[in-house]
Amino acid sequence: MSEAPIPSHWAAQRERGSFALMRLTAWAVRVLGRRTMAPLLYLIVLYFYLFGRSARDSARQYQGNLARWSGRVELQPSTRSVYRQFMSFAEALLDKLDVWSGRVGRERLVIHDQANLHASLAGPRGQLLVGSHLGNLDICRALAEMGGEVRMNVLVHTRHAEQFNRLLDQSGADNLRLIQVSELDPATMLQLSQRLERGEWLAIAGDRVPLHGGRTAMADFLGQPAAFPQGPWLLAGLLECPVNLLFCLKQDERFHVHLEPFAERIRWRRADRDAVIAQAVQRYADRLAARCLEAPLQWFNFYPFWNTQDPRRD
């Protein structure tokens, strides 16, 4: 386990102008439409592809690890495949704005839910969804719409949560809220517990460590050690709520939403808490790796994801 901050942190990169850019882009899409905005957004992403060496190297590292871990030679990275991953990200940004604007109808959703979890959306007590930055986590909004009046609370690390909520209000996203959770202090835990008791659901990404460090657990991911946040699993244990996994992958212009039950409860004793959390993190990493094979170019963590300093690599 570790509490050390991660160099070249993803959040430090995203915070720079992220809200202003999202506000401008959301306005432009509303006024000009997706068809007009798409070429501009692709040009912006192309710029970051050409001049963002760290992001290119990170995408190449991911593709190389995926190819070696899976044994699938066709997934080996190339200049073309790395470029296509960036273009997939541009497409996902446009899809994100469509979701926020309510333009993703049920006819574009394909729900894979063998346990019939989405029927629980209207239950008396909420549950926790753990997603990732593979595919489009913002489909939570469309999922909330399926539950009628169910409110979905997306837990984020950005300092601009309230500003984003104003954008959501302007787009008519009444059932979706962003909540900043920099740390799990008593006030935050009380608020989240109350939301669950009101039947609201929580969603959080399980693949990114908060900006100011935070407790992490190492897991084998695509054949290499990587640091994952303990936060989602600590949250689930403290709130004593069911935990489910959520993946949303785009295939043939439709969004395939995969809902998987993960644990009825995350329980630990003081002596074995770290071991229980580490086991949950590894299970999550295994499921995430399997989903990467279904949409290999929809991995949108463009920063050094693998911790090369982990002693297990020596």
Regions found by a protein language model. Name each.
Residues 110, 179, 260:
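General small-molecule cofactor/ligand-binding pocket signal
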Residues 36, 136, 299-300:
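Short hydrophobic/aromatic residue motifs in ordered secondary structure
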Residues 2-131, 167-169, 176, 251:
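Membrane-anchoring hydrophobic helices of lipid-metabolizing enzymes
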